[in-house]
Amino acid sequence: MSLETLARRYGTPLYIYSADHIAHRLELFQKAFSTVPHLICYAVKANSSLAILKMLAARGAGFDIVSGGELERVLAVDRGAAERVVFSGIGKTAPEMDLALRAGILLFNVESEGELELLSERAAKLRRRARVALRVNPDVFAETHPYISTGMREHKFGIEIARARALYRRAGKYLEPAGVSVHIGSQIRAAEPFGAAAERVARLVAELRRDGHAIRYMDLGGGLGIEYHAERPFDPEAKVREYAEALIASAAAVKDVKLLLEPGRFLVAQAGALLSRVLYVKKNGQKTFVITDAAMNDLIRPALYQAYHEIVPVAARRGSRKMVADVVGPVCETGDFFARDRELAAVRPGDLVAILDTGAYGMSQASNYNTRLRPAEVLVEGRRARLIRERENIGDVLAAERRALKL
């Protein structure tokens, strides 16, 4: 089924994903870590579509969550997958802890002294034993956008390694110190920072074991990046192999430990595209603007992170000329753009364009800004395409307010 057919059937803006691509990327991870005990815990925040979670759960993947809502999504597709869930995040609430305790998740990644105390209280109240890993801050610099760098001491995440041993000693009766966790950021393309962080975690695991703690998990987080520029070489198999070799070598000094990995973007980003229809092409002085029916509420990465995405016409015209333009949406902000001063194949109103590599942090960050309706989503499996999320309608958007106001 062609992209134009999908766009006509389901409308635009429209997210489309390749199930085969996601499955292949998961296989690359499994193969790269096949020499050591491991569990791939997909980072739900990257793309929380129920259909994608279901296909990953069916392939034995675990899940990295950062909210009770994300846990509810995992439980909705496979309640048995709770035993493969790690719960990260710096602001877990008591109700979220209770939900996770009752579900029987694999591991709580604890990020502060206060969180450890609250989790101990909730576990005692429910009489549920909780396996915990302290997320330590390794003070490792990762070359990435500052908003998604998380492993330096000035960041809000984790606990100083120097304080970790003392906090483990304070684990209450219903808490089982079972692991150590680290996560240094997202969209990191070099292997060295991951290896440096893993080395520091491995040393801490050895110290904790000498203290008498039966540490059996090293959660080394996620963050492996992709290449968004089409002209730059990117070999995903070589990249994940290099990443795995760095982590395995750094953790080699620690025996009888299971590695937990939390890939998100690497699995799903390049599986997705956002289809959008060109509404207008206009000029302001020397500037050309391509106005699409997609906007920053559908894909905020360019506005938020100055992120680059390739934008291509779905049906290029023979001998079509090039144009230099800003590709923008209808939202009432100058920051509503997908590309600035971009050379692309000339387009005109009615043309369908694809914004590439939007399978991660696209729909999961979409909003209703300007009371715009969030897009539909389609999953392509082989030659079959199926709707996995209906396009929002105005009734969906207004429902909570109408109930509150009895309108």
What do these predicted ranges mean?
Residues D256-L407:
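Charged (often Lys/Glu-rich) extended helix/loop segments that serve as interaction or gating elements
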Residues D64-I65, N109, A133, S181, ...:
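Conserved beta-strand positions in the central sheet of alpha/beta enzyme cores
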Residues P138-Y280, N370:
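Active-site loop/helix belt of alpha/beta enzymes
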Residues C41-Y42, F63, S88-G89, F108-E111, ...:
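Glycine- and other small-residue-rich loops at beta-strand/loop junctions that grip anionic moieties
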Residues M1-A130, R169-E176, R210-H213, R383-L407:
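A charged N-terminal "starter" segment
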Residues I22, K45, S67, A100, ...:
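Conserved, mostly hydrophobic/aromatic
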Residues A46-S48, G69-E70, G91-T93, S112-G114, ...:
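Active-site-proximal loop/turn and secondary-structure-junction residues that shape catalytic pockets
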Residues I52-K54, L75-A76, M97-R102, L119-R122, ...:
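Short acidic, glycine/serine/threonine-rich loops at helix termini
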